[in-house]
């Protein structure tokens, strides 16, 4: 994608015509106000400051102009491996010190990512931690390399390989981008390989590779530091100069020149996928690099072709020809080249060849009709409104300003970016279609289930994919003890860097003023006013969750919500979509366990018109039989597709283990296919009539609104209904777990085992719930948790592991979840059991004090964005919490004693009374689990 889709703005002026006419006046040039100051240190380090005093938060972003494209053949994946290493250690922070410090001072964790062209590292903390994070990030950049040993490199290789297994090797269609990059770019081209690299190349990486990469690329003159938030610029400049200024400049790095891909003929490839249950076709065309003049028109082109009811590909392939249930695509722009992608899967029982006549028909229709000015302006308006989401946090601004500086040398390049998107014309869209897609060579890749080669596109050649074979004993963690490391060499400094800076000045934690009211029609309204941007976020919660559905037809509640998006009595689906988008608004309807949620985002001036559309959707559904049929077909296709996804399998089987067959939650959202087939349109109408009413509704709103406007808009949200409200039936109890049992779902040749360890636990309204969440924080709630520190950092078994309490009004669970390397399945479960079991007894007063400090200081980051505020209102309204519930919870946590902690852990953490669910390769792993002491594992799909 062009960077336009990711930039951040403080203000965008969009002038739209009235909703009823659904005609859009082209947006005027945006009025932007992202204040920033840029300066460069003598060593070449670019520094950007952005001051935002709306919240007591500061964020820092370190952007290095190096990604996988700077790697050499035989060392693919190295830039990403280096990203992992840089987080681990530095001379003055110590091993794991960066994450430990972030947690201790109230941050929400450090993070980063690597692309083909850059690597970014970032964190946000309360404002009094500014000097601490500047000190820490400088220590990473300048005082890192002496801490790296071959043991450190070898251990982190295992983590990265687990990430590859989780994201690529153990997922349906996971190898698609690998196949395309190998086919599209010649050997030696920087984009011939994926960012994650190959397992063989990762294995080959050594300590000298780390040193060479660091010396060449991680130098001040190739790095941008961006600081955003509530801080004093003069003080911050002094800090940056002190901590970063003495890092030596590196060699000059020449700029990258564009190297676009060239295809002289189309390529047709296939891959039999171990995890695919339905075929998929991807089509890829060579395109252009980021900021190329044509990149903006290509963004709009792919959006118009694939998004929405009137999109030409959807209109023909889904609605008319019914050969697929979904089409997607994106324009992937990178620094020196780009690709245009299209993805489509045939409906069940069809092959990929059957897609092509319909696809060609859709393209021909587009060639005939083109794109209208209204459609063009509507897409532009939607892109612009999306920008606001990125400016609500200090961290989002830091990341984007740094990224612009890396690639253009100008943090303010967003002005040019916006101007470029505004300049795209309908002729431009047609021109880039003709130049890059029509009759142009492409790469077709067919994926199909193993053993079903006949489903591929006719004439396809087998793609070369290197599949990992996980062998028992291979990939074992080295004898690794990071605490024992001794530095033989240190990097000199003009001052003692081992002393962590003190906290800055104290600050007042802002408290949101929560407005609440009950309207005459019974709707409860909750609001928080915020005028940082001219945006409003809202959510209407209706007590119409899937708990009210039928065991015989579990999908009724979810399908009702889905179908309400498919038109109204006055508007077809296409007309409704156009009416919403013409306002620059978004409206979505989703269904959860206990409620249905109508969520939206709108510009302040269009709030009334947007709410009018919400009313129309809720009160005057179209109940279109054709749309119902299409919806059911899509859900059936999605269920089939999920049957090969290990994570989806885990969720489905876990529901069965937790609840009896006569409980609605025994099933996932739509239930099994045979039950879905029986759902009728009349079922949805009846559910809507029974439960969609004012007495069941709570409205939450945050942003730049007035109370009078909200009250006026909501007064006739629901029509009067004469029949009484149907009482919620009492659901059966969840299955009781008194002893642990292991359940295994076999996915032959799985590269990882998906673990889900769970038991029933607290409801969200239980007085102990916030305290239980607190005690889980050091166990599995953060990167530095005991579970993650052991299984990922120390052992290299997983890319990540989390634990947590999840609750609603009537039920709750405690679970531990992870994906681990196949050949350490037993060892991972053993560690989890022991860590959870010993957690309470071994917990110390020092650890308790750190936990309290982290949770209490972290409150500063909990109320920064509109989404944060809306989430808080959601909890207040759903669970009848007091407006100051967070402050009350903080007091309870502060008062917790060590004995309180241990008692809570003993009561709620019970590793010997949990279901242990494993989704993985039974042939190699199941027998080994017998020695864990939980009896013989139960094979869940043994008859299949």
Predicted regions and their residues:
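Short, conserved secondary-structure transition motifs
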Residues: 160-167, 259-272, 379-391, 602-603, ...
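M16 family metallopeptidases and their MPP-like homologs
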Residues: 50, 55-71, 77-81, 96-143, ...
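Proteolytic maturation boundary segments
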Residues: 19-47, 232-273, 280, 314-315, ...
């Amino acid at each position: 994608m062009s960077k336009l889709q990711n930039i951040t703005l403080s203000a965008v002026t969009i002038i739209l015509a009235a909703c009823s006419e659904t005609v859009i006046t082209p947006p005027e040039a945006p009025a932007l106000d992202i204040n920033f100051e840029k300066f460069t240190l003598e060593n070449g380090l670019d520094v950007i400051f952005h001051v935002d005093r709306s919240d007591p938060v500061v964020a820092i972003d370190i952007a290095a102009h190096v990604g996988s494209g700077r790697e050499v053949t035989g060392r693919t994946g190295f830039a990403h491996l280096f990203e992992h290493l840089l987080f681990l250690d530095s001379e003055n922070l110590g091993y794991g010190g960066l994450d430990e410090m972030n947690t201790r001072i109230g941050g929400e964790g450090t993070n980063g990512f690597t692309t083909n062209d850059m690597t970014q590292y970032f964190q946000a903390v309360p404002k009094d931690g500014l000097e601490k994070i500047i000190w820490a990030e400088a220590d990473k950049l300048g005082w890192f390399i002496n801490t790296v040993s071959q043991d450190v490199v070898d251990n982190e290789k295992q983590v990265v390989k687990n990430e590859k297994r989780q994201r690529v090797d153990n997922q349906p269609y996971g190898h698609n981008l690998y196949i395309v990059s190998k086919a599209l770019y010649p050997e030696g081209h920087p984009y011939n390989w994926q960012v994650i690299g190959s397992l063989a190349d990762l294995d080959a990486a050594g300590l000298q590779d780390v040193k060479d990469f660091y010396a060449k690329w991680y130098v001040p003159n190739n790095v941008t530091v961006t600081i955003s938030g509530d801080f004093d610029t003069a003080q911050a400049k002094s800090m940056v100069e002190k901590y970063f200024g003495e890092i030596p400049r590196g060699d000059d790095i020449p700029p990258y020149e564009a190297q676009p891909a060239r295809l002289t003929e189309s390529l047709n490839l296939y891959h039999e996928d171990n995890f695919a249950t339905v075929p998929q076709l991807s089509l890829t065309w060579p395109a252009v690099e980021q900021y190329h003049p044509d990149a903006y028109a290509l963004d709009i082109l792919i959006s118009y072709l694939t998004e929405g009811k009137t999109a030409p590909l959807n209109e023909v392939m889904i609605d008319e020809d019914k050969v697929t249930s979904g089409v997607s695509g994106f324009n992937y722009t990178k620094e020196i080249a780009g690709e245009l992608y299209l993805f489509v899967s045939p409906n069940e029982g069809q092959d990929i060849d059957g897609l092509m006549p319909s696809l060609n028909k859709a393209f021909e229709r587009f060639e005939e009709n083109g794109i209208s000015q209204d459609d063009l302006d509507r897409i532009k308006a939607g892109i612009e409104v999306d920008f606001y989401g990125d400016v609500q946090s200090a961290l989002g601004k830091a990341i984007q300003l740094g990224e612009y500086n890396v690639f253009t040398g100008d943090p303010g390049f967003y002005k040019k970016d916006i101007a470029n998107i505004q300049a795209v014309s309908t002729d431009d869209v047609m021109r880039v279609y003709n130049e890059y897609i029509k009759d142009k060579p492409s790469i077709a890749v067919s994926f199909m289930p193993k053993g079903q080669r006949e489903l591929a596109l006719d004439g396809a050649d087998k793609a070369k994919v290197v599949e990992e074979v996980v062998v028992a004993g291979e990939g074992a963690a080295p004898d690794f003890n990071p605490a024992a490391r001794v530095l033989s060499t240190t990097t000199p400094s003009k001052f003692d860097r081992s002393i962590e800076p003190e906290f800055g000045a104290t600050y007042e934690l802002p408290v949101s003023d929560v407005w609440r009211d009950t309207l005459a029609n019974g709707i409860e309204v909750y609001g928080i006013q915020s005028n940082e941007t001219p945006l409003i976020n809202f959510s209407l919660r209706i007590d119409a969750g899937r708990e009210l559905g039928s065991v015989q037809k579990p999908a009724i509640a979810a399908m009702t919500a889905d179908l309400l998006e498919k038109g109204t009595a006055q508007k077809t689906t296409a007309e409704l979509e156009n009416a919403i988008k013409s306002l620059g608004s978004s409206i979505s309807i989703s269904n959860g366990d206990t409620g249905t949620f109508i969520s939206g985002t709108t510009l302040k001036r269009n709030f009334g018109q947007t709410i009018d559309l919400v009313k129309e959707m809720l009160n005057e559904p179209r109940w279109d039989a054709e749309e119902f049929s299409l919806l059911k077909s899509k859900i059936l296709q999605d269920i089939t597709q999920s049957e090969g996804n290990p994570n989806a399998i885990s969720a489905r089987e876990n529901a069965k283990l937790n609840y009896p067959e006569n409980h609605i939650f025994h099933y996932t959202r739509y239930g099994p296919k045979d039950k879905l087939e029986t759902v009728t349109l009349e079922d949805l109408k009846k559910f809507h009539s029974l439960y969609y009413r004012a007495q069941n509704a709570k409205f939450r709103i945050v942003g730049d609104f007035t109370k009078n406007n909200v009250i006026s808009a909501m007064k006739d949200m629901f029509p009067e209904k004469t029949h009484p409200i149907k009482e919620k039936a009492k659901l059966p109890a969840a299955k009781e777990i008194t002893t642990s049992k292991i359940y295994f779902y076999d996915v032959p040749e799985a590269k990882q085992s998906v673990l889900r360890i769970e038991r029933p636990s607290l409801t969200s309204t239980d007085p102990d719930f916030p305290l239980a969440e607190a005690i889980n924080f050091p166990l599995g709630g953060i990167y530095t948790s005991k579970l993650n520190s052991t299984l990922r950092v120390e052992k290299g078994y997983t890319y990540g592991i989390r634990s947590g309490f999840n609750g609603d009004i009537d039920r709750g669970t405690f679970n531990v979840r992870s994906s681990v390397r196949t050949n350490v399945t037993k060892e991972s479960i053993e560690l989890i059991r022991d860590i959870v079991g010993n957690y309470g007894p071994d917990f110390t007063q020092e650890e308790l004090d750190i936990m309290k400090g982290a949770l209490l200081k972290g409150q500063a980051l909990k109320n920064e964005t509109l989404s944060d505020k809306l989430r808080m209102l959601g909890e207040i309204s759903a669970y009848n919490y007091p407006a100051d519930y967070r402050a009350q919870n903080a007091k309870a946590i502060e008062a917790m004693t060590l004995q309180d902690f241990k008692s809570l852990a003993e009561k709620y953490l019970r590793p010997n009374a949990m279901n242990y669910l494993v989704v993985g390769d039974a042939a190699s792993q199941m027998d080994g689990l017998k020695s864990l002491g939980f009896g013989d594992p139960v094979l869940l799909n043994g008859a299949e």
